[in-house]
């Protein structure tokens, strides 16, 4: 009896999972035209009028999902801040994402217009464009949507909107308040973001921060990342002759700034990539659990 009960529970869970997957797929297909219209909006951060059109589109979508939306002025392009309060006593989860895209270089694209999404199928020769009617083919795992920002980073935002639409249509609410922080200059290194975080500290406060961006594992499997690499920058200046000198006269006599700099850089890491700068790892501790998780990530060496 116990084994039958366990089997029944397991079957119900599997059926529920399949049901959610089928619903998610159906909603995704229903929203393809909306996604294509979203991708059709150029989003080069160097073109302010393009970003303004994207802000208008996203604002309308979020208001329809009961968000309070406002722009936060920065020293460069504005941020878009959207809040959905479920209950004031609940924790708040902030989601950061960016909706600008890199400038388009048509010579790198195999389609006439990178802002006109195309459905493509993987073949032995790469990817080839196919009719959009094939999007309903549930058995084909080799379909891809090609357009500027289809993955980085409009795709995650579109999925986020569809998930919220599902919850709203089914009278369901998450167990937390939602805060969206949308950046429009990520591809430009977000020059206005650092100061904005300080200036709007109270408005950006949250209990948890999730980032809807970042690379996927080369296996193609959905990837959750529980931490991000930071960055530290500095400027090194090496000195040499006041003006260019002829190597036949002064080669190996005057110091070569490029050689000096290469020696400094070469001294910073060993042959295995470990940083040799004293104190670099002094405040870093990895538990056995974390080490086990990291070691369990499949190797990518063969694919890269």
Residue locations for each model-derived region?
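Bacterial Sec-dependent N-terminal signal peptides
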Residues: 1-19
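Acidic/His- and Gly-rich active-site-bordering loop/insert found
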Residues: 17-148, 167-176
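Predominant activation on well-ordered alpha-helical scaffold segments within soluble catalytic domains
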Residues: 59, 158-161, 194, 259-266
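Generic secondary-structure signature for well-ordered alpha-helical cores
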Residues: 63, 169-172, 198, 202, ...
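The feature captures the short pre-catalytic strand/loop hairpin that immediately precedes
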Residues: 136-140, 235-248
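Acidic/histidine-rich catalytic neighborhood of metal-dependent amide-processing enzymes
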Residues: 141-227
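Acidic-enriched catalytic cores of C-N bond-cleaving enzymes acting on peptides and small amides
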Residues: 217, 226, 247-304
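Flexible glycine/proline-rich, aromatic-decorated loop/lid segments
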Residues: 225-239
């Amino acid at each position: 009896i116990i084994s039958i009960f366990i089997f029944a529970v397991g079957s119900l869970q599997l059926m529920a999972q399949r049901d959610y997957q089928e619903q998610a797929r159906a909603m995704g297909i229903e929203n393809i035209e909306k996604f294509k219209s979203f991708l059709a909006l150029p989003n080069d951060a160097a073109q302010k009028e393009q970003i303004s059109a994207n802000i208008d589109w996203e604002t309308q979508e979020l208001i329809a999902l009961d968000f309070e939306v406002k722009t936060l002025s920065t020293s460069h392009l504005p941020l878009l801040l959207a809040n959905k309060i479920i209950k004031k006593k609940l924790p708040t989860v902030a989601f950061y994402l960016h909706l600008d895209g890199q400038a388009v270089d048509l010579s790198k694209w195999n389609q006439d217009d990178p802002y006109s999404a195309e459905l493509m199928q993987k073949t032995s020769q790469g990817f080839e464009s196919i009719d959009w009617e094939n999007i309903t083919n549930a058995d084909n795992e080799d379909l891809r949507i090609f357009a500027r920002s289809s993955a980085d980073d409009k795709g995650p935002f579109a999925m986020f909107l569809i998930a919220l639409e599902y919850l709203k249509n089914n009278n369901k609410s998450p167990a937390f308040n939602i805060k969206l922080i949308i950046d429009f200059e990520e591809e430009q290194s977000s020059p206005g973001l650092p100061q904005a975080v300080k200036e709007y500290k109270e408005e950006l406060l949250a209990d948890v921060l999730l980032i809807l961006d970042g690379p996927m594992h080369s296996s193609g499997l959905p990837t959750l990342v529980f931490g991000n690499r930071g960055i530290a920058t500095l400027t090194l200046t090496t000195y040499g002759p006041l003006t260019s000198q002829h190597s036949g006269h002064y080669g190996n006599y005057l110091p070569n700034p490029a050689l000096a700099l290469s020696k400094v850089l070469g001294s910073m890491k060993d042959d295995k990539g470990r940083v040799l700068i004293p104190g670099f790892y002094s405040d870093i501790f990895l538990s056995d659990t974390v080490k086990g998780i990291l070691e369990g990530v499949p190797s990518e060496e063969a694919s890269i």
